[in-house]
């Protein structure tokens, strides 16, 4: 199975730019190899921060954006599994993240999507999860 992003769907009104898409693909590949609950923040095909092994996604997101610091502005964020609540997206947005990739499929996907849309961000759904427990 080769995941190149061709089958991903855009859940938001705004589609990613070419640079954002490259960063989303890079972050997704990194998240795939990190212990769950994995969150990766990346920009210019460089990992800026990661959160892993936490009991929930929002704690992983907090770790990732803290490591990225000010460089998170305009960055991409990848989650190795679905984002069950909008809090993970809100943490990313609060630190300047403007592009998200996640499997999708959460009961509350519409809330996460609306949060990203409201901030002018883009969000892609892969349809594939990567758990490393």
List where the protein language model places each region.
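ATP-dependent carboxylate/acyl-activation modules
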Residues: 1-133
């Amino acid at each position: 199975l080769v995941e190149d992003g061709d089958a991903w769907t855009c859940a938001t009104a705004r589609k990613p730019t070419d640079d954002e898409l490259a960063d989303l693909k890079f972050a997704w590949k990194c998240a795939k190899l990190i212990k769950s609950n994995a969150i990766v923040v990346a920009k210019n095909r460089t990992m800026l921060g990661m959160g892993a092994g936490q009991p929930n996604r929002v704690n992983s997101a907090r770790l990732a954006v803290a490591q990225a610091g000010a460089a998170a502005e305009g960055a991409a964020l990848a989650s190795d599994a679905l984002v069950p609540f909008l809090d993970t997206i809100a943490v990313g947005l609060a630190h300047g993240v403007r592009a998200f990739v996640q499997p999708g499929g959460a009961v509350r996907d519409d809330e996460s999507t609306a949060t990203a849309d409201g901030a002018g961000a883009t969000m892609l759904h892969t349809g594939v999860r990567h758990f490393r427990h």
